[in-house]
Amino acid sequence: FESVTAVDSINLTIQSGTYCCLLGPSGCGKSTTLRLIAGHETPTSGDILISNKNVTVRPPAKRGTAMMFQNYALFPHLNCLENVAFSLKMAGHKKAERNERAMAMLSLVEMQDLKNRLPSQLSGGQQQRVALARALVGNPDVLLLDEPLSALDPFLRKQMRAELKQLQ
């Protein structure tokens, strides 16, 4: 096998309230970089700073980040509303509050009418919108999106770009 270097060296400063897109060919380390920032991978050297705070050893839930994975990572046994509200439940929010916040995010991505459906009952684009709502519900400092528009049709892709810009 060839020697594989997963993200050799990177220094990246992103101003608050701005977009940053990582572009490159498949296998160049874009997803790995996002997973490192989110805390789902551990760097072998260097530090990860968010808002000038070293978060390198913090678990994902303590970093102020949310990641929407390329494969969506929705819980198959939970409906849309429960998927979006899950992190709020784990954080100890009361059911009424978490359902209200989850519904607001489902409305934002135009999935409120499908709140009771399981992921297996949704199209790829619908699953992607639920995953985005789940990433947004905790109001993260840093939102990490891995291929956020890939499963959307051209109309929804344009609409989602506008919604992401509005969230900025």
Regions found by a protein language model. Give the residues of each.
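A short, proline-enriched helix->beta-strand linker immediately N-terminal to the Walker B motif
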Residues: V137-D141
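ABC ATPase NBD coupling module
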Residues: K53-F69, M90, K94-N99
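Catalytic Walker B motif of ABC-type/P-loop ATPase nucleotide-binding domains
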Residues: L143-D146
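Conserved ABC ATPase "signature" region
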Residues: N54, K89, A96-D113, E163-Q166
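Short coil-to-helix segment of the ABC ATPase nucleotide-binding domain corresponding to the Q-loop/switch region
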Residues: L78-F86
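The feature captures the beta-strand-to-loop junction immediately N-terminal to the Walker
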Residues: L23-P25
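Conserved ABC ATPase signature
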Residues: L118-L122, Q126
